[in-house]
């Protein structure tokens, strides 16, 4: 077994709760810090407006606290999604460590599968977060949940699910593929710096590739009755706003995803290393 394979074997052989805890902690901290970018990005996508007027209108009419609107739901979303994604990826990597396949392909497939699993696990929270971010006033969680259920039943919590799977699966696959490749090159810089820089590179690259799909999915989640299908929504945005409409909010999203992924991966790797040290026989 080569050094890289041996490192992977050790890295992905930790107890499941290590990845759950590290993934959950890193995702929750990340979410709190990037919440304002997420609120503005979602409003730009669903209103097809630009950054300055959306930010100005939000703060003037609703106050600074509006930038964290729906953050309780979003924190739960990030906790569930982050824990599920990192657990799934680590266990899949452990299971495929002896697979005779290109490392980049394995990372992509494991990342895609992890993203799909995490999406299915956390999707109702994602739907509620998107709706809350678009409201002018912060709704109470229980009444809002009851309202969604009364209007559309269980399906109301899963609008555009298949399209989210199509978007998030490949996004997660690209992220982990780019991250592992970047981290392998940058590892001589040390764990903290290599994980931070690799998170920025992988997050930005993956987001740029999948952003148009994200715009359509967010629009479908917010206005599910306005469109017949993913294609209908895509064409409607394109006809009304062109290519720019599909990338509306990309600049804000990049401001969010670059530091967000840097924070997530830095805290995740450091937490995982700490748990590994504490669990070692020598500790």
UniProtKB/Swiss-Prot annotation:
Disulfide bonds: none annotated. It comes from Schizosaccharomyces pombe (strain 972 / ATCC 24843). Its main location: mitochondrion. The keyword Cytoplasm does not apply. This is Uncharacterized mitochondrial carrier C1604.04. Solcar repeats lie at residues 14-95, 102-185, 190-274. Pfam families: Mito_carr. Gene3D superfamilies: Mitochondrial carrier domain. InterPro entries: Mit_carrier, Mitochondrial_sb/sol_carrier, Mt_carrier_dom_sf. One of its GO terms (molecular function) is thiamine transmembrane transporter activity. Coiled coil: none annotated. Keywords: Membrane, Mitochondrion, Mitochondrion inner membrane, Repeat, Transmembrane, Transmembrane helix, Transport.
């Amino acid at each position: 077994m080569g050094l890289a394979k041996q490192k992977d074997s050790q890295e992905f052989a930790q107890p499941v709760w290590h990845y759950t805890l590290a993934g959950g902690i890193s995702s929750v901290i990340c979410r709190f810090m990037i919440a304002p970018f997420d609120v503005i990005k979602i409003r730009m996508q669903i209103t097809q407006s630009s950054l300055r007027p959306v930010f100005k209108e939000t703060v003037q009419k609703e106050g600074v606290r509006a930038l964290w609107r729906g953050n309780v739901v979003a924190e739960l979303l990030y906790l569930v999604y982050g824990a599920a994604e990192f657990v799934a990826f680590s266990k899949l990597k452990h299971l495929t460590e002896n697979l005779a396949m290109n490392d980049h392909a394995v990372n992509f497939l494991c990342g895609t599968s992890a993203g799909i699993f995490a999406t299915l696990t956390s999707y109702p929270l994602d739907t509620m977060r998107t709706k809350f971010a678009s409201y002018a006033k912060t709704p109470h969680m229980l009444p809002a949940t009851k309202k969604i259920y009364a209007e559309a039943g269980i399906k109301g919590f899963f609008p555009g699910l298949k399209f989210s799977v199509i978007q998030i699966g490949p996004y997660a696959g690209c992220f982990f593929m780019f991250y592992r490749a970047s981290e392998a090159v940058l590892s001589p810089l040390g764990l903290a710096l290599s994980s931070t820089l690799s998170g920025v590179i992988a997050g930005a690259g993956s987001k740029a590739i999948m952003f148009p799909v994200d715009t359509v999915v967010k629009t479908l989640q917010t206005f599910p009755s306005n469109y017949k299908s993913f294609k209908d929504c895509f064409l409607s945005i394109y006809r009304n706003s062109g290519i720019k409409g599909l990338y509306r909010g990309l600049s804000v999203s990049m401001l969010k995803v670059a530091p967000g992924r840097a924070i997530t991966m830095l805290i995740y790797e450091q937490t995982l290393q700490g748990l590994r040290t504490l669990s070692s026989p020598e500790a």
